[in-house]
């Protein structure tokens, strides 16, 4: 533990006398300290600056070019307050265009930062908005169509912390970087010379880009020393394509207190916590026993994601309790969730997620050729059979029965298996259509609830489906009632071979030029067409 960290703890906890407790055992030097992003707050005139730039980072002793917001890698934690307007100047110092999307924020389309909110290379974009939503852990990342996966892989991601009066009154752990700790989890693949090795090709367009190295806040298997008592972890799955399943190595429980859009009604006790790409959960864990343990991710049954070293529980970070104790608590109740309104007479939108069968077949072949049988480890046999037959399926894989034909582009469908030129950049679909930035698929009405029915039937891939401009409630997830910790405010829902239904409402405008997006948050699916724009 570095001296400055030690002083930070001593000052924060008022324990100058803790110095003699510095033992070699407690602060084993072999693990890097968990990097803690700086808090970025608005200045006296309610402004803040974000600079998108290239830098250098070191992984396993090798230097790599990385991208970050206000630094070499990742970014600060942007602190916002409910009801308080903020102006953000975003300077793009990269040699290519980017955008900055406020993931999870309920703000107008013009400031949402989707693929239309281009910040040119060397240019600046200024956005002003007022968060009117409840306290939540959200995030920022790029959203340049066709390049989102690469720009995120290069390191662009940062947390957004929305605060409000309600959460301040709860006695939750709230000492930033001490007992209130951000945990941004990402996998990376590196080339032999240590550079981030990103490709968008047929294999990654099918299963996503995944790596064999896990980073936590940009460090490999770091350690965090925290005071005994309740430790609050703000978990973000910042991976391009890998779903996670978070647990404690000694099986101690995690108490989920918040999902994407804020507090749950009451804590939910779990021993493992699946985390889809783009999702956030806040958990409290009791470390008052003083025993060190690892936060780990358990193997998942997702195509290609149980390849070593992820075929076994894999450490995310080490948690080392200190001898001093912090004062945060786990409340019995957290907030009041509004009752779900009647679903009678609501506009229903049917969205069907699918992949060109040729991409499915060729992607699987490349995956098997590269990784052999372990590419399929953890997959159940039904999924595997569906994939293996995928290449011969042609139109059979498309389930026309459940489709909302109004959104279908039958021309594009007709080309699919009739000698149409295959282009993997346009091989993932919603309602049979590839994303078109200039053609929003529909117009939602402001302030009105809608029921969205999102189907992955006939496609066994995992699709974490994310909707911009809203925090919704899950009515059913992949054909089942949502788990208790997924009944709160969400912006991402699991679609995996089944049907999920969500209740959405949009309280801000999104004109055609700055439409909201709805898309798969497996970034390579998004970049190759599985996205739609809609207006409000």
Swiss-Prot record:
<dbReference type="InterPro" id="IPR045087">
    <property type="entry name" value="Cu-oxidase_fam"/>
</dbReference>
<feature type="signal peptide" description="Tat-type signal">
    <location>
        <begin position="1"/>
        <end position="28"/>
    </location>
</feature>
<feature type="binding site" description="type 3 copper site">
    <location>
        <position position="521"/>
    </location>
    <ligand>
        <name>Cu cation 2</name>
    </ligand>
</feature>
<comment type="similarity">
    <text>Belongs to the multicopper oxidase family.</text>
</comment>
<dbReference type="InterPro" id="IPR011707">
    <property type="entry name" value="Cu-oxidase-like_N"/>
</dbReference>
<keyword id="KW-0560">Oxidoreductase</keyword>
<dbReference type="GO" id="GO:0004322">
    <property type="term" value="F:ferroxidase activity"/>
</dbReference>
<keyword id="KW-0677">Repeat</keyword>
<feature type="binding site" description="type 3 copper site">
    <location>
        <position position="103"/>
    </location>
    <ligand>
        <name>Cu cation 2</name>
    </ligand>
</feature>
<feature type="domain" description="Plastocyanin-like 2">
    <location>
        <begin position="229"/>
        <end position="295"/>
    </location>
</feature>
<dbReference type="InterPro" id="IPR011706">
    <property type="entry name" value="Cu-oxidase_C"/>
</dbReference>
<feature type="domain" description="Plastocyanin-like 3">
    <location>
        <begin position="424"/>
        <end position="536"/>
    </location>
</feature>
<dbReference type="Pfam" id="PF07731">
    <property type="entry name" value="Cu-oxidase_2"/>
</dbReference>
<feature type="domain" description="Plastocyanin-like 1">
    <location>
        <begin position="53"/>
        <end position="165"/>
    </location>
</feature>
<comment type="subunit">
    <text>Monomer.</text>
</comment>
<feature type="binding site" description="type 1 copper site">
    <location>
        <position position="463"/>
    </location>
    <ligand>
        <name>Cu cation 4</name>
    </ligand>
</feature>
<dbReference type="GO" id="GO:0030288">
    <property type="term" value="C:outer membrane-bounded periplasmic space"/>
</dbReference>
<keyword id="KW-0732">Signal</keyword>
<comment type="function">
    <text>Multicopper oxidase involved in copper homeostasis and copper tolerance under both aerobic and anaerobic conditions. Is responsible for the oxidation of Cu(+) to the less harmful Cu(2+) in the periplasm, thereby preventing Cu(+) from entering the cytoplasm.</text>
</comment>
<keyword id="KW-0479">Metal-binding</keyword>
<keyword id="KW-0186">Copper</keyword>
<feature type="binding site" description="type 3 copper site">
    <location>
        <position position="141"/>
    </location>
    <ligand>
        <name>Cu cation 2</name>
    </ligand>
</feature>
<feature type="binding site" description="type 3 copper site">
    <location>
        <position position="468"/>
    </location>
    <ligand>
        <name>Cu cation 3</name>
    </ligand>
</feature>
<feature type="binding site" description="type 2 copper site">
    <location>
        <position position="101"/>
    </location>
    <ligand>
        <name>Cu cation 1</name>
    </ligand>
</feature>
<dbReference type="InterPro" id="IPR006311">
    <property type="entry name" value="TAT_signal"/>
</dbReference>
<dbReference type="InterPro" id="IPR002355">
    <property type="entry name" value="Cu_oxidase_Cu_BS"/>
</dbReference>
<feature type="binding site" description="type 1 copper site">
    <location>
        <position position="520"/>
    </location>
    <ligand>
        <name>Cu cation 4</name>
    </ligand>
</feature>
<dbReference type="InterPro" id="IPR008972">
    <property type="entry name" value="Cupredoxin"/>
</dbReference>
<feature type="binding site" description="type 2 copper site">
    <location>
        <position position="466"/>
    </location>
    <ligand>
        <name>Cu cation 1</name>
    </ligand>
</feature>
<keyword id="KW-0574">Periplasm</keyword>
<feature type="binding site" description="type 1 copper site">
    <location>
        <position position="525"/>
    </location>
    <ligand>
        <name>Cu cation 4</name>
    </ligand>
</feature>
<protein>
    <recommendedName>
        <fullName>Multicopper oxidase CueO</fullName>
        <ecNumber>1.16.3.4</ecNumber>
    </recommendedName>
</protein>
<feature type="binding site" description="type 3 copper site">
    <location>
        <position position="519"/>
    </location>
    <ligand>
        <name>Cu cation 3</name>
    </ligand>
</feature>
<feature type="binding site" description="type 3 copper site">
    <location>
        <position position="143"/>
    </location>
    <ligand>
        <name>Cu cation 3</name>
    </ligand>
</feature>
<dbReference type="Pfam" id="PF07732">
    <property type="entry name" value="Cu-oxidase_3"/>
</dbReference>
<dbReference type="GO" id="GO:0005507">
    <property type="term" value="F:copper ion binding"/>
</dbReference>
